[in-house]
Amino acid sequence: MKKVLKGGTVVGGSGSVRADVLIDGEKVAAVGTGEEMERLADEDTQIVDVEGCLLFPGFIDAHTHFDLHVAGTVTADDFATGTRAAVRGGTTTIVDFGTQYEGESLADGLRNWHEKADGKCSCDYGFHMSISDWNPSVSRELDDMMEAGITSFKLYMTYDTQVDDKTIFEILRRLKEV
């Protein structure tokens, strides 16, 4: 179903403009005014008056910790509650820190985080990957992590998952190659 948000102020990276927004299904299909939007709409299009409202794109929260067990405790939100709260605040994408615990491969850690998130999220999501048990096998996994969509890695310098300075240097040197 199509919907036009009519008469709002669209806020973007280059400023704000008074415009209408056409939504087709779950996607923004067009931003424009007047005749252009009338041409794109059909008789079934729902018109929503948003005069005086600011229209923002969905926000991205690139630093979340859902269902994380660390330092003898568990974070307050899991993927269901955390993403519900995110959506209510205008966030449409989160990037959570998948964690490799001691003795796990990075692939195991990523698989565990997917199991925690899959089917429970109210918004789009991706992962960073925390490296806490560095060894030659984990080093060889970094290319596979990139292919799986992991483009950033976290190293804890505190808590029970911390890595020492020498290990940080080794990991950064290896990541430079990836």
What does each model-found stretch correspond to?
Residues 8, 26, 52, 63, ...:
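Divalent metal-coordination and catalytic microenvironments
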Residues 1-4, 10-57:
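Histidine-rich, glycine-flanked metal-binding segment
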Residues 9, 32-35, 51, 70, ...:
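Short, well-ordered turn and helix-capping elements at secondary-structure junctions
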